């Protein structure tokens, strides 16, 4: 008799439909949260596509960025940028966004602010001035050291054919 009771005690009763439904909703909610966090994090990461900023960071590294406009929210004010900041901007001379350091700030004859940028590994400044409207983001730094995740961007470069 004792053996029969143990077998019955070990059997798990089927979950009622309400518990299964709640469990499924929690699982779906978990996946939605993971996807949203991934999207938000992806908005704050950028893959380095060239060696122009070596040895600060290398091709295939991922840098943490502060965007100028994230979902309509002004996260970074370009007028707060200073010499030494590393920015990502839409260049008129290159098809991909460029990640370079601000080496000088100028006021144009039109009264607008323009930035002179240069890759740390390049011998000369970039060929044209950068307007505040071209700036997409600033690389986040802690104690003058940019936040870099080494080499994990190679997969993205391979997929994009860069």
Where do the PLM segments sit?
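A residue-level detector for short acidic-glycine micro-motifs
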Residues: 50, 104-106, 137
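Extracytoplasmic/periplasmic/luminal assembly and interaction segments
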Residues: 71-110
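Extracytoplasmic
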Residues: 43, 58, 82-84, 97-100, ...
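Extended, hydrophilic extramembrane loops/domains of integral membrane proteins
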Residues: 112-156
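Surface loops and adjacent helix of pleckstrin homology
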Residues: 68, 92, 120
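Protein maturation boundaries and topogenic segments
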Residues: 1-76, 80, 144-162
